[in-house]
Design a protein with these regions (language model features):
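Short aromatic-glycine-(Arg/Gly/Cys) micro-motifs in beta-strand/loop hairpins
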Residues: 1-14
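Short, glycine- and small/hydrophobic-rich beta-strand elements in well-ordered beta-sheets
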Residues: 6, 46-48
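Short arginine-rich
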Residues: 10, 35-45, 83
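Short, well-ordered beta-strand elements within core beta-sheets of diverse protein domains
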Residues: 14-22
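Short amphipathic alpha-helix segments
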Residues: 26-34
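Conserved glycine-rich FAD pyrophosphate-binding loop
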Residues: 50-52, 64
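A generic structural motif
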Residues: 52-59
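C-terminal structural segments of small proteins and small subunits
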Residues: 59-87
Length: 88
């Protein structure tokens, strides 16, 4: 299994990461992009939004709410999405 970047932390049987954005609207745009990506993966994170900060947590409910390869795969895809939207 390919390793997930260190910015994701495994806590209480979930894979978690926070992303900070310059504005509330850019945070919401990211949430919408994550939603579309999640649909393609048929795997959906728990999402929280606190002004400019988006929190994501992943676990595989079908396997008893544990972290699986499916979670790591989506985490890597989300990281690629985030990097593709970073200001240059």
């Amino acid at each position: 299994m390919e390793q997930t970047p260190h910015l994701w932390k495994e806590q209480e049987h979930t894979l978690c990461r926070s992303f900070v954005f310059p504005t509330f609207l850019t945070a919401i745009d990211f949430v919408n992009e994550v939603a579309a990506l999640s649909e393609k993966h048929h795997h959906h994170p728990n999402i929280s939004v606190d002004y400019r900060c988006v929190g994501l947590s992943l676990s595989t409910h079908d396997n008893g709410n544990i972290v699986t390869a499916k979670d790591h795969k989506l985490a890597r895809a989300i990281d690629r999405l985030y990097r593709s939207n970073e200001p240059r």
